[in-house]
């Protein structure tokens, strides 16, 4: 089963705030038709555990599209082997450091009219296994219309396999391991802790 949210909104949509996004995630998790939670956890669900929204984690980034895109198999937590391309790169400054995140496109979703402009940013950082899920987190993205974009880590969320073992989740590539703490977005679920996989490239 697929393991990430498909709540994708335009980066430039200032009306859809970080708070609104988090409220939408809570609604998704509370709804039995869209929630990844097991029945027992769904019955007791009140809210996901978020870091306090912090504007320091809303950064301006420069998007560079990769013209020569090569397909590859992105490793997952199961034997599922989804095909992706590295669609582009985001360069930004956070906590005084110049950082980069690679942005990927699912080849399956790229032919779906509803999600053809959907991009995917799986990443790890120094909070994993401590305050956040050990397997990393995800950000949703859309193909931008311009090179200057906004990257909002307050919208970082856990893969569904952090909540339910029936899901198959992409493992963030090592090239998307950020050498900083991203104390924004969704925290780890309950006392769930999984060590980062540093062997995936």
Question: Across the structure, where does each feature detected by a protein language model lie?
Answer:
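Acidic, glycine-rich flexible loop segments
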Residues: 120-157
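Extracellular/lumen-exposed scaffold segments
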Residues: 40-45, 50, 70-86, 102-103, ...
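Terminal leader/tail segments of proteins
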Residues: 55-57, 69-75, 144, 175, ...
